[in-house]
């Protein structure tokens, strides 16, 4: 409860006012300028009926208060009370809030945090680093934060709902709050900085009523032109684009156990359990491969006065911000403030991998996509019709090589494709020795959201099994119909796999008449409530449909390498590694040739205890398989128009809230369970991880004197605080491969490390392994020399190129002009300008060359540049490669025709 000393002394000036009166006033306008709501302010002075606008307009409420000496005012949207004299929010009636069956407007000041925590305990409340400054009382910390709305800035509800759902994912939010020193990038538009600022505003202790995410909105438009303008977009496509860009800006090279930078491994085997993570960098191709590993994710703690101290507490106090916005609070601020790879010797991959390997290795930026259901490759929403994108690879870690894995991109279907058409060919990607060395990368995004699926295709003639591992960031699940449910339930009872193309037969090839009739039937059915025409569909049914076996026959026959011809086959998949946060996307949108429609079937989903063990591969290293719901995004409307909202569970008090743009409303959990889910976020749950953190807290509180103090990665410690499976300690977030501090990180190393007492370090090291142990921080001299050498090399190469190119431009008629691939040249340019730390591989002109008549010629429409012969020879001497392609060559002068001269001379002699 609020201490008596904290009560505002001006509360006596309030007259009698009821909630009904305030609601009635909220429907009015400002009495000075006539502007309407939201966020009008009503004067609470006795017998004063004044209603004025807030700071978002002319702030007539403040002008009225200063002129009339009226101290208290209430926001008619959030019902929060502000005192102008005390310059702070005040609380009228602190009392517990009991669960209600209907939604009511959220009033954080009316909630007793103690009773809330008691009545609604979280299943897994992680421990987080405490606020060292102690600026907030324990009671204030337990009051819910994060209940801040977002203003709709032009059909932006799809963005607002997605951001609110992400904001209520504690591992991600706490990273941006507590590991702000790691949010550094020189990549435009620096979306991670915009997102970090937004998170700090949403979770600020001053609890603003709403914010305007303008900066992030502009940034996402720069990343993907699809979001420009003010048309309604798909929230799932926005999520993929945002998270992919955050990964690109925050990714770091992954170090292997020996301390070196981990690179692409050409020979990997599933049997050895040496599964390697994929780099999440995106690609334009369908089934491309890349590698990445996992690393540590977050750390926390502070260094203060040289004392070794580990401050940890419940997660409910972990989410805090550094900047404030909103209306009356500003008065107070004026005073202060994956590689797809063969897993057996005969493993196959999609032929798209051959053409796309170079693009994957240069990490072209494209939004990520979800793993498609084996039996359903139809586009699932509007955005997928316009912006087909590929799946990036990503990492994960564990003590027994838990974090190693193969990864690849799943096939992305054509909009008019009615079934999976897989064309497999022998993998060739790793056979070329001329490729640039590729480091593997990880980021907080890949650590939290990336999982992997083991896909197997079996030839039914020779029984050969081809195995691949696909990295996913979200699972796009089909919604089975009545017939599909019958097949699924039948297969469950019979303990046999479904081989009938679950959820796809209804969309298979058919005649025009039957196609039109079936389309009309499905359109009519989609307009009827699901309870009228179909059985209850559960999320487990959707998962079963996704993982059901799919026959490859007819037009979708499997090209078997052993048989050397098309054969009937069967494809099925299992989860190889579960992500910390599982994002599930229900495919509610269908796009036919002539129209689009939405599947309005209600899909029931559990708030707690979603178990994925039935869908886990036997090779999976994942130990924890149960999930609890964090947030759910809902779409109301049709395929052509509608509105997005989000339901999220507040991590502080365990209550559920509806986020509808700038309005935040507390709701009962039954409202959430009855929602028409579109995107769901589930988090791994484990009581053991909570007890693990409690043991560390107890060790830290012992304050045993120790002769040695250990530095640990702030990122990994934060990961320990928020993950159920944090993996081995990884101190290479602040160490180089030589064991020192990279010169580029030394000036902000305090933001990257936390000092632990010896007993805490020993417990964590014995429990999780990893390392290395660090007792002293020093700048790495080897890295310093390498940086200086690299700088000299860059300067020499760019100066020489500029000199040779000037000479080339000065030539009026150069005898020889050679071509160079602009793709390779851009890589080289990024290297010499310092944008890329790794030099490019050998010159690769293969994509701009074509063989004609036994001679290499320039391919028509190729992306190339023209350079002089001297420039070509200079670059060739450094990087090698080829082939040489000339657009103008030296023409030898023709032999002089002396026959005519001799004839004239002979005739002259004859005369």
From Swiss-Prot:
Residues 279-309, 327-420 are annotated as: Disordered. Zn(2+) 1 binds at residues 8, 10, 83, 86. Its EC number is 3.4.19.12. It comes from the Eukaryota. It is found in: Cytoplasm, Perinuclear region; Cytoplasm, Cytoskeleton, Microtubule organizing center, Centrosome. Keywords: Cytoplasm, Cytoskeleton, Endocytosis, Hydrolase, Metal-binding, Protease, Repeat, Thiol protease, Ubl conjugation pathway, Zinc, Zinc-finger. It catalyses: Thiol-dependent hydrolysis of ester, thioester, amide, peptide and isopeptide bonds formed by the C-terminal Gly of ubiquitin (a 76-residue protein attached to proteins as an intracellular targeting signal). Belongs to the peptidase C19 family. USP20/USP33 subfamily. This is Ubiquitin carboxyl-terminal hydrolase 20. It comes from Danio rerio. The gene is usp20.
């Amino acid at each position: 409860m609020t201490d008596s000393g904290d009560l505002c002394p001006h509360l006596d000036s309030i007259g009698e006012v009821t909630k009904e009166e305030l609601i009635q006033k909220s429907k009015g306008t400002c009495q000075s300028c006539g502007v309407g709501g939201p966020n009008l302010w009503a004067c609470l002075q006795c017998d004063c009926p004044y209603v004025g606008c807030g700071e978002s307009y002319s702030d007539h409420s403040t002008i009225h208060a200063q002129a009339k000496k009226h101290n208290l005012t209430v926001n008619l949207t959030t019902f929060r009370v502000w005192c102008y004299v005390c310059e702070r929010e005040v609380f009228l009636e602190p009392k517990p809030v009991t669960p209600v069956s209907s939604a009511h407007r959220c009033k954080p000041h009316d909630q007793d945090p103690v009773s809330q925590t008691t009545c609604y305990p979280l299943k897994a409340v992680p421990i987080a680093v405490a606020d060292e400054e102690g600026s907030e009382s324990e009671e204030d910390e337990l009051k819910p934060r994060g209940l801040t709305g977002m203003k709709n800035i032009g059909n932006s509800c799809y963005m607002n709902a997605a951001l609110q759902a992400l904001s209520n994912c504690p591992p991600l939010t706490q990273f941006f709050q507590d590991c702000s020193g790691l949010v550094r990038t020189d990549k435009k538009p620096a979306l991670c900085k915009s997102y970090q600022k937004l998170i700090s505003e949403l979770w600020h202790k001053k609890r603003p009523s709403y914010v305007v995410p303008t900066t992030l909105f502009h940034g996402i438009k720069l990343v993907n032109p699809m979001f420009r303008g003010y048309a309604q977009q798909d929230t799932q496509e926005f999520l993929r684009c945002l998270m992919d860009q955050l990964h690109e800006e925050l990714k770091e090279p992954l170090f292997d156990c020996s301390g070196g930078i981990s690179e692409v491994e050409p020979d990997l085997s599933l049997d050895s359990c040496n599964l390697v993570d994929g780099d999440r960098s995106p690609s334009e191709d369908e089934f491309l491969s890349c590698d990445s590993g996992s690393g540590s994710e977050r750390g926390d703690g502070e260094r203060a006065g040289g004392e070794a101290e580990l401050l940890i507490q419940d997660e409910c106090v972990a989410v805090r911000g550094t900047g404030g916005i909103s209306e009356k609070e500003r008065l107070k601020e004026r005073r202060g403030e994956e590689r797809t790879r063969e897993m057996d010797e005969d493993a196959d991959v999609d032929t798209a991998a051959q053409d796309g390997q170079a693009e994957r290795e240069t990490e072209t930026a494209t939004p990520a996509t979800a793993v498609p259901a084996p039996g359903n490759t139809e586009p699932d929403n509007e955005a997928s019709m316009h912006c087909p994108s590929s799946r990036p690879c990503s990492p994960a870690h564990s003590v027994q090589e838990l974090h190693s894995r193969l990864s690849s991109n799943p096939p992305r279907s054509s909009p008019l494709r009615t079934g999976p058409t897989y064309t497999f060919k022998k993998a060739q990607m790793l056979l070329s020795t001329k490729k640039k060395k590729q480091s593997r990368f990880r980021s907080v995004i890949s650590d939290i959201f990336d999982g992997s699926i083991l896909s197997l295709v079996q030839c039914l003639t020779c029984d050969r099994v081809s195995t691949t591992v696909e990295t996913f960031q979200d699972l796009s699940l089909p919604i089975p119909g009545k017939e599909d449910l019958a097949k699924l339930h039948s297969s469950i009872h019979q303990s046999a796999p479904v081989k009938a193309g679950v959820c796809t037969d209804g969309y298979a090839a058919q005649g025009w008449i039957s196609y039109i009739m079936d389309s009309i039937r499905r359109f009519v059915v989609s307009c009827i409530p699901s309870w009228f025409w179909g059985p209850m569909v559960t999320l487990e049914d959707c998962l079963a449909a996704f993982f059901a076996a799919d026959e490859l026959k007819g037009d979708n026959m499997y090209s078997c390498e052993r048989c050397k011809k098309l054969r009937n086959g069967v494809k099925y998949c299992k989860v190889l590694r579960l992500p910390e946060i599982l994002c599930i996307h229900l495919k509610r949108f269908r796009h036919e040739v002539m129209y689009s429609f939405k599947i309005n079937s209600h899909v029931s989903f559990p708030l707690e205890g979603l178990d994925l063990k039935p869908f886990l591969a036997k090779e999976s290293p994942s130990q924890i398989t149960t999930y609890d719901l964090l947030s759910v995004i809902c779409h109301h409307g049709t395929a052509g128009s509608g509105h997005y909202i989000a339901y999220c569970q507040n991590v502080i008090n365990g209550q559920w809230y509806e986020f509808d743009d700038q309005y935040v409303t507390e709701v009962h959990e039954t409202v959430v369970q009855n929602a028409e889910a579109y995107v769901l976020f589930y988090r791994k749950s484990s009581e053991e991880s909570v007890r693990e953190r409690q043991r560390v807290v107890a060790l830290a509180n012992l304050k045993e004197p120790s002769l040695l103090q250990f530095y640990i990665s702030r990122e990994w410690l934060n990961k320990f605080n928020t993950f159920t499976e944090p993996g081995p300690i990884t101190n290479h977030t602040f160490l180089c491969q030589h064991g020192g501090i990279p010169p580029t990180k030394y000036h902000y190393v305090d933001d990257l490390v936390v000092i632990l007492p010896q007993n805490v370090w020993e417990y964590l090291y014995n429990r999780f392994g990893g390392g290395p142990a660090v007792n002293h921080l020093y700048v790495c001299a080897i890295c310093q020399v390498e940086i200086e050498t690299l700088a000299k090399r860059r300067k020499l190469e760019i100066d020489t190129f500029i000199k040779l190119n000037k000479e080339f431009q000065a030539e009026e008629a150069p005898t020889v002009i050679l071509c160079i691939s602009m793709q390779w040249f851009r890589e080289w340019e990024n290297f010499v300008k310092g944008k890329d730390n790794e030099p490019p591989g050998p010159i690769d002109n293969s994509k701009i060359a074509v063989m004609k008549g036994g001679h290499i010629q320039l391919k028509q429409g190729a992306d190339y540049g023209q350079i002089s012969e001297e420039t070509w020879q200079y670059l060739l001497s450094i990087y090698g490669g080829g082939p040489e392609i000339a657009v103008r060559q030296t023409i030898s002068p023709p032999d002089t025709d002396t026959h005519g001269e001799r004839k004239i001379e002979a005739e002259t002699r004859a005369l």
